[in-house]
From Swiss-Prot:
UniProtKB keywords: Cytoplasm, Endoplasmic reticulum, Ribonucleoprotein, Ribosomal protein
Protein name, per record: Small ribosomal subunit protein eS21
Family membership: Belongs to the eukaryotic ribosomal protein eS21 family.
Lineage of the species this protein comes from: Eukaryota, Metazoa, Porifera, Demospongiae, Heteroscleromorpha
GO terms, biological process: translation
Pfam families for the chain: Ribosomal_S21e
């Protein structure tokens, strides 16, 4: 597909699951995308930046989305500490 300037553009850009690395298809209506804001540690205010995470419907259906998000956020330095014991 082309825009008004004649440049070729994609209509659909597939997302990748942050937890499993799977491609999230266009028809995966159970998939979610989360934007987690960057917060200044001293003032507690949002700095304007954010990190985006996508979780596929497959991970959500297994009930593993909370563990996966905690693992990813700990890896990226957003969360600190060990995973909570259930």
């Amino acid at each position: 597909m082309q825009n008004e300037a004649g440049e070729t553009v994609d209509v659909y850009i597939p997302r990748k699951c942050s937890a499993s690395g799977r491609i999230i298809g266009a028809r995966d209506y159970a998939a979610v995308q989360l934007n987690i804001a960057d917060v200044d540690e001293k003032t507690g205010r949002v700095t304007g930046g954010f990190k985006t995470y996508a979780v596929s419907g497959f991970i959500r259906a297994m009930g593993e989305s909370d563990d996966c998000l905690h693992r990813i956020c700990t890896r990226d330095g957003i969360c600190a500490g060990e995973q909570p014991q259930s």
